Regions:
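Conserved phosphate-coupling serine/threonine residues in phosphotransfer and NTP-handling enzymes
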Residues: 4-6
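Asp-based, Mg2+/Mn2+-dependent phosphohydrolase catalytic module
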Residues: 8, 12-114
């Protein structure tokens, strides 16, 4: 599941460019900014994704690279928040409420262990 604040046209561009249909159904698995929900840090987009997945929020793992997204996931009750440190230092992101740990890339071994 992808929950993004990006607009549909941007999502569609990346969906095609990176051939994401290998892993995600565009209509079922991707929730994007469509004007019906407040933007992050409001938890609405993550709550919608969690409802769509059908599990409890505490069972959800979120990968997020922005502080507003981390705040959104935390407010939605995500059980595990993995901060992806693209521009910020991992140590700074790990100090944010709800962050389990921060990674610099998806080869981090902690992802496989949890």
């Amino acid at each position: 599941m992808i929950a993004t604040s990006a607009e549909a046209r941007n999502v569609d561009f990346y969906y095609r460019r990176f051939v994401l249909d290998r892993w995600f159904d565009r209509e079922k698995d991707i929730i994007c900014a469509d004007g019906t929900m407040p933007s992050k840090p409001h938890p609405a987009i993550y709550k919608k994704a969690m409802e769509r997945l059908g599990g409890e929020p505490a069972q959800c793992r979120v990968y997020e690279d922005l502080t507003t997204g981390i705040a959104s996931a935390y407010a939605a009750g995500a059980g595990e928040i993995i901060a992806v440190a693209s521009a910020a230092l991992p140590e700074k992101l790990e100090q944010l409420p709800g962050v389990t740990y921060a990674i610099s890339d998806f080869t981090d071994e902690r992802i496989r262990k949890s």
